[in-house]
Amino acid sequence: MLKKLKCKKDMSQIVVGLDIGTTKIACFVGKKNEHGKIEILSMGKSESLGVMRGMVANIEKTVQSIRTAVQEAQSRVDGELTIRVVNVGIAGQHIKSLQHRGIYTRNAFEDEISQKDIDALIEDMYKLVMQPGEEIITVLPQEYIIDSEQGIKDPIGMAGRRLEANFHIITGHVGAVLNINKCVQKAGLEVKDIILEPIASAESVLSDEEKEAGVVLVDIGGGTTDVAIFHEGIIRHTAVIPFGGNV
């Protein structure tokens, strides 16, 4: 039996994922446990009637499929739950990735590097100029360089003046992202975050040891195939191939 939500304060620990696929739309409801891991409370799914190769082709049909999946997920929770905010997975043939190095010069090298410094470096990546019609969806740090010292995975607390980082940047078509947002909003939901599906799949099934040793994840869906490559614990490449099990 699914675990019952004990009280209202538990709602702050609820996480909802929405997978808008070519053949089905799935809604997962999870709750963070005392170890910070996600326990699945319920799942709902519906036939995907308005999506082709990971991209929305019919707004109204996609909205109806989303509503059906969300309502089913809500009904299967042992306790009252109203889903309002979702994390949406994104894929589709419009998704691309690129590598870029960012540089952030700090005012005082003797001060410890903080999360604020890292956030400033990441924020600069979102200001990169993309091709017309494309936008940056996600910026993933790979490794950091402090005053020419390379291979640093966590620079917080270290000293240095010049902070650099190699980034894996995910881009997508503005129209495709807007259509996903529009479908979710018309279904009465709010988008908390948009997550690249190969990354979400990797976090679900790959261990830290596998990522460190080197691994390729291949997720064959109905209309697309997602690929993610890890080595030394770092995301090296992602891709969405516009062919799947039904194509």
Could you describe each region identified by the protein language model?
Residues 1-24, 28-217, 234-238, 245:
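Nucleotide/phosphate-binding catalytic cleft detector across ATP-hydrolyzing
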Residues 231:
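A cytosolic small-molecule/anion-sensing beta-strand core signal
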Residues 22, 221-224:
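Short, glycine/acidic-enriched loop or turn micro-motifs at the edges of active sites
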Residues 226-228:
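A structural feature that tracks compact, well-ordered secondary-structure segments
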